[in-house]
């Protein structure tokens, strides 16, 4: 919520998400820029929650907003949104278990991978992190199957035919796409 206000655009986004009938919704931070937007943010997340369980991590702008993590956590709990700040939750899928791991923003050096559970049979481990520099911290023993990140905005600014010339700190050259 860049301007901190919930509006018709957010209703349209919520409607489009609900129409997709997702099983889960994952958001990797940069939810908020100004503290005045906090109630509007959770109104939006609650609308998304009508479609599917919502799992959220924090990004650099969430911290820059000045809102304490405890305030995010209290509102997330109240609205049944799963806020993961260096934490893991487990979801039964009927074919096994999904471990959803969320770390605090790696670009601000707040990520702690000690929350990644050990490898287990019939478990798929998904890591949610705001910045792609989390890839520099992940090791083979972490047994993570998929990492979802944001922060790079797909290259921030791009001119057709010219390689990306600026990325936010914390991307470490990763613009968009798949990295192994």
Where are these regions (language model features)?
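Solvent-exposed loop/turn segments at secondary-structure junctions
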Residues: 31-34, 60-64, 89-91, 105-108, ...
């Amino acid at each position: 919520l860049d301007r901190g206000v919930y509006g018709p655009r957010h209703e349209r986004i919520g409607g489009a998400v609900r129409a997709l009938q997702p099983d889960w919704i994952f958001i990797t931070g940069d939810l908020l820029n100004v503290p005045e937007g906090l109630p509007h943010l959770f109104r939006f997340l609650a609308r998304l929650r009508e479609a599917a369980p919502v799992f959220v991590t924090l990004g650099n702008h969430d911290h820059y907003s000045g809102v304490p993590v405890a305030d995010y956590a209290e509102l997330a709990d109240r609205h049944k949104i799963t806020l993961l700040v260096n934490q893991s939750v487990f979801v039964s899928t009927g074919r096994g278990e999904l471990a959803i791991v969320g770390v605090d923003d790696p670009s601000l050096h707040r990520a702690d991978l000690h929350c990644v559970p050990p490898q287990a049979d019939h478990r798929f481990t998904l890591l949610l992190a705001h910045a792609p520099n989390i890839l520099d911290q992940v090791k083979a023993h972490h047994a993570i199957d998929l990492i979802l990140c944001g922060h790079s905005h797909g290259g921030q600014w791009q001119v057709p035919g010219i390689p990306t010339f600026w990325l936010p700190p914390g991307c470490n050259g990763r613009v968009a796409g798949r990295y192994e």
